[in-house]
Amino acid sequence: MNHLYRSFKTIALVGKPRNDINLQMHKNLFHWLMERGYQVLVEKEVAITLELPFEHLATLEEIGHRAQLAIVIGGDGNMLGRARVLAKYDIPLIGINRGNLGFLTDIDPKNAYSQLEACLERGEFFVEERFLLEAKIERASEIVSTSNAVNEAVIHPAKIAHMIDFHVYINDKFAFSQRSDGLIVSTPTGSTAYSLSAGGPILTPNLNAIALVPMFPHKLTSRPLVVDGDSKISIRFAEHNTSQLEVGCDSQITLPFTPDDVVHIQKSEHKLRLLHLKNYNYYNVLSSKLGWLKSF
């Protein structure tokens, strides 16, 4: 076999299978890669379930240090969870879509092996970088908790259907005050996720921009605001707010805080590196996922 175009020697399989079909795909792909001479690592929990030899077991951190590519099997949720961890290791990710929409998972499971062969064996791919957000909780002038987010950081009360009052500062300058169910702070990657459902704008992935999208604001003039991607966003809260507030990162990580704390959100120093097939077209993804069909 011609290995002229091979860019990767060690490839990791990651994801959390929801059913036997997804688990079987992990197993099949493991053997497919092994047969082609790749060194293969498999996320620890899956490898144990599949009873793979010990040398193939690896945590996400070990994968970050040892692998040159991670293949995510699952939906966007699986991609988000792995991307937050692996971004700091500068390892590219490509996804096989086993979820619903699949904005971040390019590969069609029906054509997975032919598409992977084009990518891995013939070098028919390119790498796209996308920025992450970093959310921090400041308490008494000290940072007490932090998390990255690929899609969005959402400020909201711990209990549903509770409104909160807050002020938003951009680069330490007052921008606006709001009474609402919360605020979505979204990356361009996240603009087609929760932000879109809340009426936020779609931002193409190459934009250096952050969207601030209110959640059920108690003011008809409240509208989404798009700011420079290098902005530092700070949110301060009224004392009469409920004592249990949260920042949700990609709906997977929760940072609790109180009205006395300050939430800071800005671009993370780490970037998500997405590996795309050569014929990838972002606008085709939008039209297929959102039903933007040609009328003539």
From Swiss-Prot:
Belongs to the NAD kinase family. Involved in the regulation of the intracellular balance of NAD and NADP, and is a key enzyme in the biosynthesis of NADP. Catalyzes specifically the phosphorylation on 2'-hydroxyl of the adenosine moiety of NAD to yield NADP. Its main location: cytoplasm. HAMAP family: NAD_kinase. It comes from Haemophilus influenzae (strain 86-028NP). The active site is at D76. This is NAD kinase. It is an enzyme of class 2 (transferase). It holds the Pfam family NAD_kinase_C. Its EC number is 2.7.1.23. GO terms for cellular component: cytoplasm. NAD(+) binds at D76, G77, N151, E152, H162, R179, D181, T192, A193, Y194, S195, L196, S197, Q252. Keywords: ATP-binding, Cytoplasm, Kinase, NAD, NADP, Nucleotide-binding, Transferase. It catalyses: NAD(+) + ATP = ADP + NADP(+) + H(+). It comes from the Bacteria.
